[in-house]
């Protein structure tokens, strides 16, 4: 190859965000299509360990813009792909998301969501389903639903209704889950 072709290939890589590392079979089978893993950092010391059993519960309490996917859902997708990208097998990825307070609207059925948000469709539905398919436990606070006058039947079918987010968070942490957020 001549120098011009090499320079063009390198420029294209920089322009489109490709790293210089060799892609592995794992990269082709990331659990969350359309979500890149965290970018590689040359020399980084702390990396996901394929031998560790990751138990993580994300507290989804923040209010999101009604027309946008909840940012914490994107973070969960990125985290799942980062674990997979670094060789952590599916059997070692135990991820839960607990929706409560302002985050509870993200798991509402589309008709209920539209009624609460001036006709806006629930932008979270597809990603929630993909997360569930990737093995993420999706939970919502039953007390929060009562407070918003929402029936359990008005929650998406991929989401488990629990008595109270506080109890869910405590129970998961007692089972060894590490809490992220909220």
Protein language model regions, located:
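Histidine-anchored nucleotide/phosphate-binding helix
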Residues: 69-88
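Acidic/histidine-rich, surface-exposed loop or edge segments in extracytoplasmic proteins
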Residues: 49-65, 108-112
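A cross-taxonomic marker for long C-terminal extensions/tails that follow the last structured domain
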Residues: 26-37, 108-182
């Amino acid at each position: 190859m001549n120098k011009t072709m090499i320079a063009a290939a390198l420029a294209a890589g920089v322009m489109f965000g490709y790293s210089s590392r060799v892609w592995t079979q794992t990269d082709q089978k990331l659990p969350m299509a359309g979500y890149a893993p965290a970018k590689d950092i040359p020399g980084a010391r702390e990396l996901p360990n394929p031998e560790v059993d990751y138990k993580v519960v994300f507290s989804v309490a923040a209010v999101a813009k009604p027309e946008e996917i909840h940012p914490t859902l994107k973070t969960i997708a990125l985290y799942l792909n980062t674990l997979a990208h670094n060789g952590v097998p599916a059997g070692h990825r135990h991820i839960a998301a607990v929706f409560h307070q302002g985050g509870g609207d993200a798991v509402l059925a589309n008709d209920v969501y539209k009624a609460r948000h001036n006709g806006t469709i629930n932008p979270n539905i597809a990603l929630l389903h993909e997360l569930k398919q990737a093995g993420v436990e999706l939970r919502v606070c039953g007390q929060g639903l009562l407070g918003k006058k929402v029936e359990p039947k008005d929650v998406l079918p991929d989401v488990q209704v629990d008595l109270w987010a506080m109890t869910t968070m405590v129970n998961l942490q007692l089972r060894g889950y590490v809490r992220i957020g909220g």
